[in-house]
């Protein structure tokens, strides 16, 4: 029988760790938190120094019973939950439930689930750090006080089922503020003049820069004509050539935020999916003969720090694979709020994505490859670029051509951050030419433009903005974005967030009656206070008390003064086939659906069917309709289902293949689409 009991959060983590520790240790999972505030009531006694009332989470009774049974038999109990505030709180709740002594050094933490890291952590157990627990408690209680006070007011005055929260309300504000900027935006006209030039056999482009050695704004067509009428012939003199060597350094290894952003850009993953896959990679992957191994370090972190050991291993790998020139001489100076943490990196550089491919699902492999390449590239030598700026002049009119070539690829051999991929002049190959020589303009083309409104938030940009403004923590970005979508406060159109009417109504009410809650500075200041609680500089109850005294008055004012708002259901444009009443559009868990307006007397509902104007290629009777899976993925089926079981992920276009006469579909890959046959290898030209 095992002498020691180790408790972790998940079965996957338990399975991995038990293999490392041997027969003297039994590792079991608590399945996350075992205690929390009750869902049926506030659970915080504001009259009694904000004392929380914790209860065993519904459904966790058997888990707690099992934990107690094993703890009673064990000589020593170790609490090995995750190395962050949430993990520390889980350990504290477990210690309370199992009646472990406060002074016991039974807390073990590791940043990666590898044999060496886990075994080493058990050599240095420590006590539970109550400052970290208090910071988590303060956050949990703050969120409960906000949510359980504002939400009932919204239910009563606006609509049942609504919610507001400390972080979600600020995230919603960002989306709505951006939408208002777009609505209020007034486009302004401006012009560009671009020229195509030739020197011997080399063709290149240049842009209008100056008139009479001064910037000259091209705000209307008359400005353009003033320039073009001054031009005389096609010869321009090269009046200045500036050559520089530019050093480009690699991006830091990933934090939670930058991982979510880059996975959204490069892999088209939602933040929630990225974190789910990262958790799987962290908790352990079965590598067959090598056993189960955690492939990456802990995935909830603000830090870009890396250990000396990881840096040394990466340096050796780079040296052997690419050569000495590709190793970096820079010492890593990563930084972050959670100093005990590292950046997100592979637990071993030697486990290359190619070697791991057969052990991972496709999406796991794609994310692991991204993390591995970003980390290894961060330890490589910088890239060296040769940049050239060439001024071309005629009659006091100056054009400038910019070009660059890569002298030494360095880290770019392996990985380039998405945003690095769009630099002016990178594809403009300039001729090797000296000052005083002449070039020929083959085409001078003015073009009219209008200023564009700021773009709506993508998920990546919203995460980046939340991080920059210090709204929430690494662990809250994904669930916050998830919540505002589930509540139907925002919708995702073409991968960009648009506020709904409901979202704007809720925001207006929260803004008018709870201005602090949506104030970015207030939210940032609260995060700073929670950090101070974690550092032991301030007590958590003082943070709660200072906030709640004024917030309570806001709640009382809202209950008295907020006017009731009636949100009318959107007419569906058809009548109920059961009772004849008008059908209306409602929002459900999986999106919009039609329901009878005579509810509750008539409970008729039906799905909203979107036809695409194509007859079903199978039964030739029904229409092809667009549907959504439970995972919100669009697919196409027959309107006569279940009589006809036609289904496809790709959109039928209503034409047959000229080669085999099966139906043609539109297949999308990123921003491009292509018409292909659903049966044979027939393809048409790609469309952008």
Curated annotation (Swiss-Prot):
Q: Name one GO biological process term.
A: DNA topological change
Region feature Disordered, mapped onto this chain: 322-349
Cofactor names: Mg(2+)
Topo IA-type catalytic domain location is 129-556
Q: Which GO terms describe its cellular component?
A: chromosome
Does the keyword Glycoprotein feature in the UniProt annotation?
no
In terms of SMART domains, this protein maps to: TOP1Ac (SM00437), TOP1Bc (SM00436), TOPRIM (SM00493)
Q: What is its EC number?
A: 5.6.2.1
- Which reaction is the catalytic activity of this chain? ATP-independent breakage of single-stranded DNA, followed by passage and rejoining
Annotated Toprim domain ranges read 3-113
One Pfam family, please name it.
Toprim
Q: What residues bind Mg(2+), as annotated? A: 9, 82
Q: Where are the zinc fingers (C4-type)?
A: 576-602, 616-644, 657-680
Basic and acidic residues composition-biased segments = 334-344
What keywords does the record list, in alphabetical order?
Answer: DNA-binding, Isomerase, Magnesium, Metal-binding, Repeat, Topoisomerase, Zinc, Zinc-finger
| Active site positions | 298 (o-(5'-phospho-dna)-tyrosine intermediate)
Q: Where is this site: Interaction with DNA?
A: 33, 139-140, 143, 148, 155, 300, 487
Which residues does the annotated region (Interaction with DNA) include? 163-168
Quick check: keyword Hydrolase in the entry? no
Q: Which GO terms describe its molecular function?
A: DNA binding; DNA topoisomerase type I (single strand cut, ATP-independent) activity; zinc ion binding
Its annotated function is as follows: Releases the supercoiling and torsional tension of DNA, which is introduced during the DNA replication and transcription, by transiently cleaving and rejoining one strand of the DNA duplex. Introduces a single-strand break via transesterification at a target site in duplex DNA. The scissile phosphodiester is attacked by the catalytic tyrosine of the enzyme, resulting in the formation of a DNA-(5'-phosphotyrosyl)-enzyme intermediate and the expulsion of a 3'-OH DNA strand. The free DNA strand then undergoes passage around the unbroken strand, thus removing DNA supercoils.
Protein family per UniProt: Belongs to the type IA topoisomerase family.
Subunit structure as annotated in this protein's UniProt entry = Monomer.
Q: What name has this protein been given in UniProt?
A: DNA topoisomerase 1
UniProt lineage: Bacteria, Bacillati, Bacillota, Bacilli, Bacillales
Which gene produces this protein? topA
